[in-house]
A protein has these predicted regions:
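PAS-associated C-terminal
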Residues: 8-10, 70, 122
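Conserved nucleotide-binding and Mg2+-coordinating catalytic segments in signaling enzymes
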Residues: 30-49, 70-84, 92
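A short pre-motif secondary-structure segment
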Residues: 108-111
Length: 208
């Protein structure tokens, strides 16, 4: 009977241990599924989930929501010239610069894909968004990352598309994201190394 009881308790203990290990594994898998493997910041899936939540919150509270799309200028040339190891290191460095450029708990920096990053800034006006952009550009200038094959400069630079909205039921979040992407395209068209902010009244481009 004692042996049976010991065996039974051992079985329970083992089962609990296995359940705990499974729970840890599930948390790790959940973490990995939302984390970009290279830069260790949020990935596109995490961005999409967060964007849905913040859009609905901004719509309900009638508060401004800012999106930014950032692209590293002439990154293919950087990669081809320096090799993929340095290219990966560059992506990691930019990711960390972006993370340090925002500080509030709900601000999100994610890798959108390739050399493109996206930022969600809840409760952020256009004026405040410009301050964040300027901080990002200054930090990248200070980092002084060599890019000898860039047609612009010997330093790495970035282009950004930025837009702020107070969403209503009439607005569509995917259409808004496309507008931000269009601003990024305009920033590239107008010489890169800067940003475009667009609203119903004006288009603004400031070279860094």
């Amino acid at each position: 009977e004692v042996d049976s009881l010991v065996g039974f308790m051992f079985d329970i203990s083992e089962r609990k241990k296995q359940e705990q290990e499974l729970e840890i594994l599930k948390k790790q898998l959940e973490e990995y599924s939302y984390q970009d493997g290279l830069t260790e910041i949020a990935n596109r899936r995490f961005f999409e989930d967060s964007y849905q939540r913040e859009w609905l919150n901004a719509q309900r509270e009638q508060q401004p929501l800012t999106l930014m799309l950032l692209d590293i200028d002439y990154f293919k040339q950087y990669n081809d010239h320096n090799g993929h190891l340095l290219g990966d290191a560059c992506l990691k460095q930019i990711a960390q610069i972006l993370k340090k450029s925002v500080s509030r708990p709900r601000d999100l920096v994610a890798r959108f894909g390739g050399e493109e990053f996206v930022l969600i800034l809840p409760d952020t006006t256009q004026a405040s968004a410009i301050e964040v952009v300027e901080r990002i550009l200054q930090s990248i200038r200070t980092a002084d990352i060599c890019h000898s094959t860039s047609p612009l400069d010997q330093r790495l630079s970035v282009s950004l598309g930025v837009k702020t909205i107070i969403p209503t039921q009439k607005n569509d979040k995917m259409a808004f994201l496309k507008e931000v992407d269009q601003n990024l395209y305009l920033a590239k068209e107008r010489g890169r190394n800067g940003y475009v902010i667009q609203d119903a009244e004006h288009v603004q481009h400031l070279n860094s």
